[in-house]
């Protein structure tokens, strides 16, 4: 038995892999103008339960933007701002973010144009700073009915973290 194990181990091959790690240090990153203390609130206001008409229907929505300034420009500047949303996914409406409020059958959706940003960072968006070092990401927050049952009366709240990376 020992000779079989020895013969098997002698035939084993080992490989090595060289990994090159790269990066870049820039003068500074951009300033997010409308996020005081790294937080902002998008108030969707109040909406009646009769505004929802079935699964996936939007009861209320509101455009908002992330404004960037002071982005370094030029050869060593920031060429791209990548924004990915993360948070707790709604268990039924997986494109939406779960609400922690007491209203039921409703989720929050963050859209860039017609595309929903998903809670796992999917459908991230890219924004390119202008020559003046500024950029805007135009987004929309929406209350969305989850499933066939109409939302119940109550508050709707969700925390969505916008992960911003620069390249």
For the regions a language model picked out, list residue spans one by one.
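Gram-negative bacterial Sec-dependent N-terminal signal peptides
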Residues: 1-14
């Amino acid at each position: 038995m020992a000779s079989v194990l020895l013969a098997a181990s002698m035939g084993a091959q080992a490989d090595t892999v060289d990994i090159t790690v790269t990066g870049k240090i820039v003068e500074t990153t951009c300033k997010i103008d409308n996020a005081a203390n790294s937080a902002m609130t998008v108030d969707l206001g109040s909406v009646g339960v009769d505004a929802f008409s079935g699964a996936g229907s939007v009861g209320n929505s509101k455009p908002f933007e992330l404004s960037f300034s002071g982005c370094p420009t030029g050869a060593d500047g920031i060429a791209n701002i990548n924004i990915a949303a993360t948070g707790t996914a709604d268990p039924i409406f997986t494109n939406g973010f779960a609400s922690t409020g007491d209203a039921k059958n409703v989720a929050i959706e963050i859209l860039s144009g017609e595309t929903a940003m998903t809670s796992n960072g999917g459908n991230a968006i890219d924004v390119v700073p202008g020559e003046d070092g500024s950029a805007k990401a135009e987004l929309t927050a929406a209350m969305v009915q989850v499933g066939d049952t109409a939302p119940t009366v109550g508050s709707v709240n969700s925390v969505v973290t916008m992960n911003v990376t620069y390249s």
